[in-house]
Amino acid sequence: MPSKSACLRHTEAPGQLEGRMLQGQLSNPEKKLIPTSASLPAADSQSSQTNSMPPLSMPAKPSNQNLQAKANLITPQPPIRPKLERTLSLDDKGWRRRRFRGSQEDLTVQNGASPCRGSLQDSVAQSPAYSRPLPCLSTSLQEIPKPRRATGSEGGSPSLWSDCLSGMISTSLDLLHREAASGGPHSRLASLRATHTPPAMDLNIASSSLRTANKVDPEHTDYKLRMQNRLVRAHSNLGPSRPRSPLAGDDHSIHSARSSFSLLAPIRTKDIRSRSYLEGSLLASGALLGADELARYFPDRNMALFVATWNMQGQKELPASLDEFLLPTEADYTQDLYVIGVQEGCSDRREWETRLQETLGPQYVLLSSAAHGVLYMSLFIRRDLIWFCSEVEYSTVTTRIVSQIKTKGALGVSFTFFGTSFLFITSHFTSGDGKVAERLLDYNRTIQALALPRNVPDTNPYRSSAGDVTTRFDEVFWFGDFNFRLSGGRVAVEAFLKQDPEVDVLALLQHDQLTREMKKGSIFKGFEEAEIHFLPSYKFDIGKDTYDSTSKQRTPSYTDRVLYKSRHKGDICPMKYSSCPGIKTSDHRPVYGLFRVKVRPGRDNIPLAAGKFDRELYLIGIKRRISKEIQRQEALKSQSSSAVCTVS
């Protein structure tokens, strides 16, 4: 039979562990402690021998002798200061782990093995002596054990469990107050985890390249204050005591700032510091015509171009509206550059340019204007792109004798935009059904006589030819009244046109003189033309949709054309090629083409236009628009005031 001290040491281990979980300070020595196996009745002694450690739910009234022995032999070990986060933790997983470990210890005890073999002596020997026992603090509110009753037991004391519970709660609350008073770390709640995987989205529109600015509900009370603070931070000087501006972030922040503060692209401070205007380079950071600046205005490096030709027949009367000509409904957006060539232009050239400026509006400025007799060419560009143009140069060619100097010839205008050189030529070739050879001669004289470029350097001199001006530029557009006709006679052409209003014009082009000569390679070498899907633009009765009804009975033909040529294949992409049947002030219908042209970065060491444009024409166009708007509003007012209600 084991000694009393050994048995006591063996049976006190569970009580000591449970005392650590609950609270073990004895405020009254007469209060009953948690019962142990030493105080069990004699009736249960047999079961105690079988199970060396009875379960905790089998309490018995302990004797005073056992209480005194416990107090003399056991000095509680001071508890470890629990962490505040763990004190407030409600993690079920940890509680299940502790319950599982406790169940394993109970099974070990029932099988005859002690769960704390030799640990109690070590803890008693190492624990310091205190004048009074310290409370055993719980590390979690979930560690409160529930009282368990064994069959046939007398039951535990209710006051004992209530005292332990109240002491534990008071100690935990005391810890909270001490932690807050000492300025310790803030309490953190346990992270929430999804219990199940959310269903897949029907459509995923996530994109790493798209990023928008954060939105705030305008109805929110502090919306104005927050927006004001953002603007102050964005435009404030970046000092050591100021908050960091959102414009000083990464590339995504710049795109977000563009949508938050201004439509203008933000400019980095470091780009300005490293920018040099003395010497240009394709790889220079911050160059005016370099890749960085080009990407700001043309991220895809493609500009929109409008090229049109119109033989005005020298009419003084201009159309009431040029919207159908310059602003066709097929185009959703306006173009970046407008180039208009006129043959047999009106006598008042300034009035013609004013009408163009008035129609395009204040968003466009006249970059250049040139004339050769009655050949006019006008270049309008978006006003924010005027700074990336070189000096504009022009040259003229006379192809006929002196008596015809004002009607036949060619006019060429060239300039460089960023790093791409452009050449625009408008021509009026010799007229007549059978004068194909004369028209070929006009073409050859033009490409040899146009002296361009002059001061602006060639972007690729190794691919240039002295005998062909079109080889000295990256992108070439040649448009005008070429006077090539449809062979076969008027009767055959009219019969073909009357067959079907939606006639396939490809059959007509088989009889086109220009198409035939281009296939031979005798004219416009290297040039291309977009597919034609409109009716012949010549010759109409003025103000009507009928072809020539005079005694000459001229054959309807595609005399007005727009051709293009590029050094690099695929740089020019035609988007639209059509005519304007609504403008009927001439015997020719205007023909236009919409293009997308690839633009490359350039160098700053070229003669720049430096924002030069026709300022006087710009102001006149604005005044015209204002005066017309006032007249329109007055007409609406007079119409509404003069309305008469009649009763029948």
From Swiss-Prot:
Keywords from the named record: Cell membrane, Cell projection, Cilium, Cytoplasm, Cytoskeleton, Golgi apparatus, Hydrolase, Lipid metabolism, Lipoprotein, Membrane, Methylation, Nucleus, Phosphoprotein, Prenylation, Repeat
The protein's enzyme class: hydrolase
Stretches the record annotates as 4 X 4 AA repeats of P-X-X-P: 59-243
Disordered: annotated segments: 1-64, 99-158
Propeptide residues according to the Swiss-Prot or TrEMBL record: 646-648
PANTHER family linked to this entry: 72 KDA INOSITOL POLYPHOSPHATE 5-PHOSPHATASE, PHOSPHATIDYLINOSITOL POLYPHOSPHATE 5-PHOSPHATASE TYPE IV
Name by which UniProt lists this protein: Phosphatidylinositol polyphosphate 5-phosphatase type IV
Species name: Rattus norvegicus
Gene behind the chain: Inpp5e
